[in-house]
Amino acid sequence: MASLKELKGRINSVKSTQKITKAKQMVAAAKLRKAQAAAEAARPYASRLAEVMGSLAAKVAGQDNGPLLMRGTGSNQRHLLVVVNTDKGLCGGLNSNIIKEAKLQARALEAAGKTVTFYLVGKKGRAPIRRDYPNGIAAGYDTSLVRTPGFDEAAAIAQELLALFEAGKFDVAHLVAPEFKNALTQLPVTTQIIPVPAPTNTVAIDAVVEYEPGEEEILEELLPRYVTTQIFGALLEREASEQGASMTAMDNATRNAGELINKLTIQYNRSRQAAITTELIEIIAGAEAL
């Protein structure tokens, strides 16, 4: 049985940890509001850009000399998984869920006879994937060098991916990233970004719009921007998901610390009471012996 001194030390240690988790919870809650607003504000832009892309793509569909980013390499053999993880921990099961989704996609592609490589964004997802796919890491981008990764970082990632695509390093690229629902729910989703998938929005396709200077010229400009926008959206969703998961995890940790403090306090009081009772019995026994 632990001594009173040891129990007191454990109680103080858990109280110190509780203060840290409570502070982290409050910081994450403050950051979440800003991150959630940014992620939600970017969604309409991405949606509208996809509609414009659909309208343009419908006009140039079937052309053999169309943009490479839309028609692809003509092969479906080499697949690149762009996995977007966080740079920091203490955010519950967010990163493990993203890694699980990436490995699930990789196994499905390999079962179909495809070749799979990875492009890693974020520090926390590197070790598990490197361990299982030591020779399957094509490249990566370190977003931990900036406090809050934004459009510039998304553009740099997109530029490197496009360079790899044009160099013939892969045929299809999929983006594996978290999608923020709320503070309790962040779901990993997989989206094809290269080549740009065919549009499914019939409203956008049926719209009668005349483009100047021409559909192909505009597509050549918009396709890289579309890839950048998808990555930028993933970074925003990642930030909101990270703060939401962190707030929830730290709230659970704070509650668990409180429960542990209560249990240790009860144990401490019982041990103290037992020690006092033992001393009284010894004193009474000694007095009776006299």
Curated annotation (Swiss-Prot):
The keyword Ion transport applies. The lineage of its organism: Bacteria, Pseudomonadati, Pseudomonadota, Alphaproteobacteria, Sphingomonadales. GO terms for biological process: proton motive force-driven plasma membrane ATP synthesis. It is found in: Cell inner membrane. It comes from Novosphingobium aromaticivorans (strain ATCC 700278 / DSM 12444 / CCUG 56034 / CIP 105152 / NBRC 16084 / F199). This is ATP synthase gamma chain. PANTHER family: ATP SYNTHASE GAMMA CHAIN, ATP SYNTHASE SUBUNIT GAMMA, MITOCHONDRIAL. F-type ATPases have 2 components, CF(1) - the catalytic core - and CF(0) - the membrane proton channel. CF(1) has five subunits: alpha(3), beta(3), gamma(1), delta(1), epsilon(1). CF(0) has three main subunits: a, b and c. GO terms for cellular component: plasma membrane; proton-transporting ATP synthase complex. It holds the Pfam family ATP-synt. It is a peripheral membrane protein. The keyword Cell membrane applies.
